[in-house]
């Protein structure tokens, strides 16, 4: 997979283009708060969240819309892992 193309759509939503298609990602203030990410880091949050998801499933299996609150609710380790990745990237 090549690096995803991340395009801000406004209102905390991003269009992510992958080799196997595209998906929209919604970054929520709660996930930002829980990861200690600044609002200016939203695109980086999207990139790292997608990397995390793609370690667990193929790009072809990603839904057309991803809400990071839903990922956090479905995967108890998501927010902690994302916070660690953000800290390592700084």
Question: Predicted regions span which residues?
Answer:
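N-terminal intrinsically disordered, cationic/polar leader segments
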Residues: 2-35, 72-89
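Ordered, soluble secondary-structure elements with a strong preference for glycine-centered loop motifs
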Residues: 35-43
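Acidic, low-complexity intrinsically disordered segments
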Residues: 42-87
């Amino acid at each position: 997979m090549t690096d995803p193309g991340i395009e801000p759509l406004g209102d905390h939503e991003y269009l992510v283009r992958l080799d196997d298609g595209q998906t929209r990602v919604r970054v929520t203030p709660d996930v930002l708060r829980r990861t200690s990410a600044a609002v200016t880091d939203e695109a980086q949050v999207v990139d790292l969240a997608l990397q995390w998801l793609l370690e667990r499933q193929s790009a072809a299996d990603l839904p057309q819309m991803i809400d990071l609150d839903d990922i956090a609710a479905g995967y108890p380790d998501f927010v902690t892992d994302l916070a660690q990745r953000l800290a390592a990237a700084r």
